[in-house]
Each structure stands twice: as C-alpha cells, then as structure tokens.
Amino acid sequence: MEKTNEKYKAYIQILKEELVPAMGCTEPIALAYAAAKAREVLGCLPDAVEIGASGSIIKNVKSVIVPNTNHLKGIPAAAAAGIIAGKVEKELEVIAEVSEEETVRMAEFLKTVPISVEHIDQGVTFDIIVVVKKGDSYAKVRIANYHTNIVLVEKDEEKLLDIPVEGETEEGLTDRSLLNMEDIWDFINSVDVADIREVIGRQVEYNTAIADEGLKGDYGANIGSVLLETYGDDVRTRAKARAAAGSDARMNGCELPVIINAGSGNQGMTCSLPVLEYAREFQCGEEKMYRALALSNLTAIHQKTGIGRLSAYCGAVSAGAAAGAGIAYLCGGGYEEVIHTVVNALAIVSGMVCDGAKASCAAKIAASVDAGILGYNMFLRGQQFYAGDGIVTKGVEATISNIGRLGKDGMKETNEEIIKMMIND
C-alpha cells in the first residue's frame, strides 16, 4: 500500500483517533467529562444535578471504581469527580489530576448535593445527559455515540451547541468501513514505521506500566497474579496474565492511564499486551513489534465497527482475537494464518456477555487471549472451524460481519435483561 493511497492515510488517522490515553474506565470518565463541561458552562458549583444515561452507560459505570475519588463507585461519583476536579480540555484524562483537597470536596458534594439518575432510551446505545443547576440557572450537556462526542451544550434556554443525533453514527471520525483484513494486512506490511511510532509507542509505554502495576499491587480478584501462580510463567501464560493484570488495576481504581482501543481501555490492553509479551519472548525487534501491534489494533477496531462501541457482546472477545492475529504475525504467520486465527478465536468465545465494567473483566480478557492463541495453534496444526460451524461462515469478512450482527442486533434483548438485573440489584 503506497503512502499516497487514501486508505493508507485513513488507516494512520484511524489509529490516531482510536489509540488515545484515558485515565480510568472510559464510561465513567465520559460521564465525568460531561459533568465537568456542564459545570464549566454553568460557571459555578451547582446545588442540584440531574443525570440521564442509557442502559449501557449505567451498566458500565455501576460497578467500577472511579479513579482519584478514594475508591468511590457509580454514576454520582463520576459526576461529582468531574464537577469538582474535572479539567475539560483533558477530555478522557479529565480527572487525571486531582488534589487531596478535591477528593475531600467530592465526598462532601455527594453528601450535600442531590444527584438524580434516570435511565433514558432515546434510541442511542451511548447516551449521557448531565444537567447542573444553581438557583434558577442551569447548564445542560449531552454526549452521544462515543466518549468525547458532545452534541448539545445549553445554558438557560440558549443552545450554545446543538448537533442533531441521527442514529448511531460517529460524525467527525474517519470512515471505519474502509477497514478490511486484506487491506489491513497490506497496510501493516508496507507502513513506514515512522508514521506509527508515536501512537503505537505510547501504547507500549502506558499499557506496559499499568500491567506492571497490576502484578505488583492488590487489585480486584488479582487474575493476573493468579494465572502466573497457577500455571507458571511460559509466554502463553504471561500473555494472558499481563493483559488481565492491566484490567485488574484499571477496573479497581488504579490511577495510571492506558491507551484505549475502540473506546475501551480493557480492549486496548487486550490487543496490545499479549502481542508485546510474544515480541519480547522471541526478540522480534522494534519494527516487527510495531507492525504486529498495528495489525492487532486495526483488527480489533474492524470488528468493533460492526458490533458498536457498547453492546452485550464482550469486547474482550474481539480484542483477544485481534491479539491472536498479532501473535500469528510475530510467529512468522502469513495472511492465511492471521485470518484463520481470527475466525477460530471468534468461534471459540463469541457469545460471552458484557455485564458491565468490573473486576471479572480481567478473567474474561484471559479467556479471550487464550482463545486467540489457541486459534493460531489450531491452524498451525492443520485444524480449523469451517463455514457452517455455528456462526462461522465462508471468509473472514463474512464471519466478522456475523459477529457484528450478533453483537449489535442479536444481543439487544440480552443487553436489556442484563441492565434490568443490574438496575434492580
């Protein structure tokens, strides 16, 4: 693929748009971002807060610890953090810098200011509305479809920004429908590594740091440490353990940032950390490692384009399959090995549900990475799943399309039932 090719430029831009830093689980951070923006527009601390959130937002915020809040959980905590300490210009790092005094003020704010939460359904899976009030004055902010996409800013009946939300589109982002496995393969083999060094290099640095912390500290169910203590430290176990350890830390209050993928820190770690571990094991060199990471990241984004940002379909599954693709490439695999790895992995663990962001995400990540590695080893030994084996159909693109259909359409009712269970808990 030539540098002058429009797809080459688009793939570089997609990586830059998707591989961005975020501090804390991205759904509560998006809520904190909306709250910080609303407070900025209001111009003072509010004396009442009203929050509307779609079911998938409620699901992903309910059980996860919001960083820099002294281990608070839930929607009110995320909103309070944004209102008290949020720096709007930092977007998904909106509460990365919080003083001890601000943490104390958050707790006091939660005790003294009424914060209402309403489940809203406006036909958009990703939907957040924050209204902050002071006396007769108010400010309102809406985020829709992706984490930093502010579509409405209103103060005292005056609309300062009003972008129509027409279904689940991602206006302003590079067209993800340009992605396909054949072109991704062409791109990663021809890309000038200098064009991706900064964006991929930051992922290596950030995600390695949080995996290290997850293995050193005591976070959640410590899945990463359990894997190493139980199964030893061969490269396959380390690949699973380090991805899980990053999630252990991230889901349970660690204040280190990660580089996300498809709007998710867990997916960003899942499609990068196993690949890094294999690259180090086989001493592949920086250039091959960067190409493998470009492959795994773009493969993950490609799958999520059909599934959507939030779904009842666990995003670790698509990221684990993508990690398998990157590992296959590092181990000397060609295009056939890569695409069969993806299909095999999807056949193994597709259907694992997302029941929100919380400690058990780390174990789901480990299972998904295991499926990615198994999918590759199957094909190495002449084994594979064929068209007609469940949701597997002829060709990698057709199978990925089926996964998108399953995640976006087929699991809608599953998502609704999970949300009902969590709201009524």
Which role does the model predict for each range below?
Residues 1-12, 45-59, 234-253, 285-303, ...:
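Acidic-glycine-rich active-site phosphate/pyrophosphate-binding loop
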Residues 2-3, 22-26, 53-60, 64-67, ...:
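A structural signal for small-residue-enriched, beta-sheet-centric alpha/beta enzyme cores
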Residues 21-37, 256-273, 314-319:
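Conserved phosphate/anionic-ligand binding catalytic regions in large, soluble enzymes, centered on
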Residues 29-128, 132:
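Early transmembrane hairpin of solute transport permeases
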Residues 38-41, 67, 278-291, 301-367, ...:
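Hydrophobic alpha-helical bundle architecture
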Residues 45-49, 90-95, 117-118, 194-200, ...:
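Flexible, glycine/charged-enriched surface loops at secondary-structure junctions
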Residues 110-253, 419-425:
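Signature of multi-pass transmembrane helix bundles
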Residues 233, 237, 250-284:
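Membrane-embedded translocation segments of transport machinery
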